[in-house]
């Protein structure tokens, strides 16, 4: 516990909350253009993860994960990006929203459809 003299000398610093998705600039989602697709995960795991390098409208160049099985994203695809990290891919702090703009929904998906941009089957 500091003394009154110490508190006069230097005041208490407020806790600053740092954003986990700075490239979105406080917006829920951002639009961007893909510049390249796929990378590999960190140590105990190995595979080609579906990841796209995206240049956002905010000017940031980020790495975003493409969720779901199969995708049609390629270079120059316009995509919508939301926050949310991927645990085994360092530096991947964003997800691409499926079913909007150029990113199509997951084919033949029955459950959890809203997360993968799939309409209700007839």
Curated annotation (Swiss-Prot):
The keyword Ribosomal protein applies. SUPFAM superfamilies: Nucleic acid-binding proteins. Keywords: Chloroplast, Plastid, Ribonucleoprotein, Ribosomal protein, RNA-binding, rRNA-binding. PROSITE patterns: RIBOSOMAL_S12 (PS00055). GO terms for molecular function: rRNA binding; structural constituent of ribosome. It is found in: Plastid, Chloroplast. One of its GO terms (cellular component) is chloroplast. One of its GO terms (biological process) is translation. NCBIfam families: rpsL_bact. Part of the 30S ribosomal subunit. PANTHER family: 30S RIBOSOMAL PROTEIN S12 FAMILY MEMBER (PTHR11652). Belongs to the universal ribosomal protein uS12 family. With S4 and S5 plays an important role in translational accuracy. Located at the interface of the 30S and 50S subunits. This is Small ribosomal subunit protein uS12c.
